[in-house]
């Protein structure tokens, strides 16, 4: 690439427009300002150490773009509507010390707060003709599922586990999550998510790679050999969205039939460490008959052939006919492995 690529700020409109076109979709975070605007921001404070939920959208301007500004961009909404791209929206809860949403006590005020966010997202995206299965809403908050129910959300939703609470340093958050990480082996976690009606399970790479996978109680799974066989058999095609996946692990994740959330978005990364070409849109521009064809340009017969082969390879539970029922030129079944841009074009250290 002749032009120098500069990674845009995480969760910015520019990052998300880049990510949805460069990958099979994007994941991003939403918070709510004092004047009732949804803004694209991950951390619970700004770099000035102010809680996001105690600031107005105007005060947040230097730190975060508005969700409405993202939805005004055709280079974001067109791929979402017309090319089978996946959009994962994470709702962020206020830090308890902010006093917002019930503060440390939470309770029904927390449910009301999250429910109002869900309704706002619903209202904002209702103007678009979004195919079923292109959007999933999720949160780490324990009150998320009752809040979604109260809001009457009709799209897919998932509660993130293990619970990383919205307070404390990264290390403290991980330590708090450890007991629930150990108690929930991946197959058990999958069953829980299926019971909750989630279309997929978001999970950490620790479950699949490295020594941590032996810490969980229950079936230990992995990305190769017997562990992978166990995982494939247990999943029956139930999708796992894995993070964080760096380029060296990308092929392993996709070959296992899983979806990768990536921070590596530079167009200069054209090859994997082993020398094979990097494929950034395995779902929305799959390899078929020796060439990469955009999903929305494939014939129905081609899509059927591709899905039949993938179903056989990864032992998906749904029949070909069931898969085709949730398929059209703008919609890719959840089972199909994807690469998703984390916070758009990847995590950045500047907020």
Predicted regions and their residues:
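Phosphate-group recognition and catalysis centered on beta-loop-alpha active-site segments
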Residues: 1-351
